[in-house]
Amino acid sequence: MLFRSRVIPAVNQVRLAPGVYQEEVVDYCREKGILLEAWGPFGQGELFEQKEVQEIAAKHGKSVAQIALAWSLAESFLPLPKSVTVSRIQSNLDCFGIELSNDEREVLKTISVTSGAPRVDEMDF
């Protein structure tokens, strides 16, 4: 990112969600002080079917979406959820104050999903 520029970006918007953790990008941005904006914090929808995520949500009395957003915040990401439904937008705000344990955060980070983030260095433009 910085090999052609001397200006460090303030924000890097990348696909980050439970099960879609781009460790190299996360580490690099944290090292450079770049805020990570988590585009697609709910993944491709399969996150809502994951038993482990449902169990964490039930334990906290929250929805899977709220848990995904709480995980993003716990990882110091800025999640960017998309919705046009007022009730879902309001529900998303209930993610604040959810305290996930380190074990729960690790489960969410490493959960197996099939629809990961595309790697730019592997794309054929």
Labelled PLM ranges:
Residues 1-125:
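Beta/alpha (TIM)-barrel catalytic core signal, keyed to glycine-rich beta->alpha loops juxtaposed to Asp/Glu
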